[in-house]
Amino acid sequence: MDADALSATPAAQAALEALRAAAGADGPMERHCLRQFAIAERLAGDRAFDRELLLCACWLHDAGLYIPSRDPYVTEGARLAARVLEPFGWPPGRLQRCMDACEQHHAPRSRMAMGLEVELVRQADLVDVTAGIVSFGLDRRWLRALFRDVPRDRFWRLVGGAVLGELRHRPASLTGVFFSPRRTRV
């Protein structure tokens, strides 16, 4: 899978560039987002979804980790999505769905009511972070092949560093990440 080839629209290219500006190119975060998108597409099955929105949300969902703030990093990710994507003239409802996908990706319960893409980002993130232990019915052979094709090396170091950074710099925000994510509006 090639991140640049996948990002065929100007909005997707801008989202990928925003991720790379924050986290670096072809690092563990970019590969996590790439795997997450592949997993989300697979989870969608034959259901119709907004592919560009899903890809942009996957690129931007964790980028808030790199933004200094007292607010939850998922909220910063939603704000970044708005800043990156507003210039492309997305209708407010579409932009809101992308922001929700970023902000709600650690929600403890389904976010299907906010849109299929929001729930796909949430489920796909959980599949990748758990290395397929949580699979939402995906074929484990397919997941193993994905993890070979888009390597997971240095991913756990990234996750550990992110958790420690959040605990050190904005510990009070963690409940807003995992238990009661807010909803930032367009």
What are these regions (language model features)?
Residues 26, 67, 71, 88:
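Short gly/ser-rich anion-binding loops that grip negatively charged ligand groups
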Residues 2-7, 20-48, 60, 90, ...:
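Divalent metal-dependent phosphate-bond-processing catalytic cores, especially two-metal-ion Mg2+/Mn2+ enzymes
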Residues 51-69, 73, 77, 98-106:
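His-Asp-centered metal-binding catalytic motifs of divalent-metal-dependent phosphohydrolases/nucleases
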Residues 11, 29-32, 36, 53, ...:
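Generic hydrophobic secondary-structure packing signal
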Residues 36-40, 72-88:
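An active-site-proximal "capping" alpha-helix that borders the catalytic cofactor pocket
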